[in-house]
Amino acid sequence: MIYKVLYQKDKIQNPRRETTQTLYLEAPSAVEARALVEKNTPYNIEFIQELSGNFLEYEEKSANFKLTTF
């Protein structure tokens, strides 16, 4: 599955919508996606969304869509 991960760059500052960033990740489950991001980055994860069907098609059309690999 492909997951959209919304995050803040660090865990020190309070989350603000204006500074939320996104990465896309392929993982077997949302739990494993979270574990991968937590293991490989200092990011503060806000939300993980599974993408499929029309949602995935829409995101793939975005210029920012790029699968992250660790």
From Swiss-Prot:
Catalytic reaction list: RNA(n) + a ribonucleoside 5'-triphosphate = RNA(n+1) + diphosphate
GO molecular function ontology, one term from the record: DNA binding
Alphabetic keyword roster: DNA-directed RNA polymerase, Nucleotidyltransferase, Transcription, Transferase
GO cellular component: DNA-directed RNA polymerase complex
EC number(s) on file: 2.7.7.6
Superkingdom classification of source: Bacteria
Biological process, per Gene Ontology: DNA-templated transcription
The protein's role, per its UniProt record: A non-essential component of RNA polymerase (RNAP).
Family recorded in the similarity comment: Belongs to the RNA polymerase subunit epsilon family.
Assembly and oligomerization: RNAP is composed of a core of 2 alpha, a beta and a beta' subunit. The core is associated with a delta subunit, and at least one of epsilon or omega. When a sigma factor is associated with the core the holoenzyme is formed, which can initiate transcription.
Descriptive protein name: DNA-directed RNA polymerase subunit epsilon
Protein's organism: Lacticaseibacillus paracasei (strain ATCC 334 / BCRC 17002 / CCUG 31169 / CIP 107868 / KCTC 3260 / NRRL B-441) (Lactobacillus paracasei)
